Each structure stands twice: as structure tokens, then as C-alpha cells.
Amino acid sequence: MNNSLHSLSSGEGPPVILLHGLFGQGSNLRGVARALESNFTVHCLDLPDHGRSPWLAHASLSSYAERVEDWMTTHDIEAAHVLGHSLGGKVAMELALSRPERINKLVVADVAPVEYPGNHDRIIEALLRVAVRPCSSRGEAQLILEESIDEPGVVAYLMMGLARVGDTYRWRFNVEGLQAAYPALRAAPRPGAVHEGGALFLRGADSNYVLPAYEAEIGRRFPASQVVTIPDAGHWIHIDQAETFQHRVLEFLS
């Protein structure tokens, strides 16, 4: 059995690894990959329990970071630039804090090295309702989500993780496993550790994921970092202001 993470690779040049958010998949970051692939070899990974990657018995930031490092070793990548959004940003921070020699430059998109409250409980409950009830169409699954989630953008994002299996539709991600692991995934990465390497934290001006109160902790854990606010962007910062986001990332990595 192949336990390696699923990946999509493109471009040529120094390696860049892209890590998606909770309930997502590597293809969510293809827009970022296309912007980088003229200068870098870009690898969009499906995190464990997501997309086409294996599911874990016990998920945590450390176990996810270990799987990313294993993938790097398997693909003969000693070190890489790593960019992560949301949960992917936490996994990227965990890897940088635990194995700094594997990170060239770190980019963290709209998340901080802090423990977050359980704001996804409502979403998880909606996902579970789809999981336990075989849906014969995408529309049926979407209606179930819309009963609990009144944000069209969130529903559209989640629907990208729905796949046809035989005559029904199922989630590509491990809903039950992610529900059980949710407290561990909300936790702060590698408490007490410090990463001295270069790091760029990009936050959306309209998002509440990287509050001003978190800047001191970012500076303490990542003393060589800079925090940049992108106007008119929410949590999906790489979509809301794609051109500005891509420019900032290219400028930093180059």
C-alpha cells in the first residue's frame, strides 16, 4: 500500500510546496501554483485525511508535518519553500518549528501560531449529515449543507471535496477522523519552539484569523518574520485578492 501523500507538480526551478486548508485539497491552490511555476517547481499536496491522500488513525499537526517531510524525503527534496493556507499554514509552521533544516522560506496565509476556538463545529455537523445519508446528486448534498451554512463561498469550497462513488456522492476527506482530531488541529503548532528562518505572514484585512493581538506571538515564535495585510481580502486571501497575493509571495521567495 502506498502511504505517500498525493501531489500535483508543475514548473521548473527550486521546489515550493503548497499546503491547503481544512476540508480542502491540493488543487485548491492551483492558481497560486500557476503564478509560481515559471520560476519554481511547485508541488500541490493533499494533506493526510484529505483529497487522494491516505487517512490517519490519529491526526495532529505533528503527524501531518511528519507526512509532509516523508513526502519530501521520498521525492529527494532536502529543503523547500513551503506555503500553507489556514490548516496548511499550521502544518507548515509545525514543520518549520520541528525540522527547520527542511524549510528554505516559509509563507503562512491567514493563520497564526495560536490555538483557535472551535468555530467549525456547525460545518462538521453539516458534513456528517451528508456522509451518513447517501446522496444521489451533488444538488442533494448542497441542499443539506445550505440548511446549516448560510455562506455561499463556504458551501462552494466544501462541494469541491465531493466525489462520485458508484451511484452516490461521498466526501474525499475523512469527516469522522477530522471531527475526532479537530481539537488537535486547532492547537498551536509546536509550543515553545522558535523558527529563526525567513517567514512571511499574509493576512486578509477582512478576516479575523490573524488578529492584531496575535502579532506578538508571531514575532516571538518567528522572529525573522514579517506580517503583511492585504486589503479587501477575507480568509480565502489567495482567491479574494489573487494578483496581490501572488505578487507578495513571488517577491518574498525571489
Residue ranges and their predicted role:
Residues D167-R221, Q226-T229:
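Conserved serine/cysteine hydrolase catalytic core
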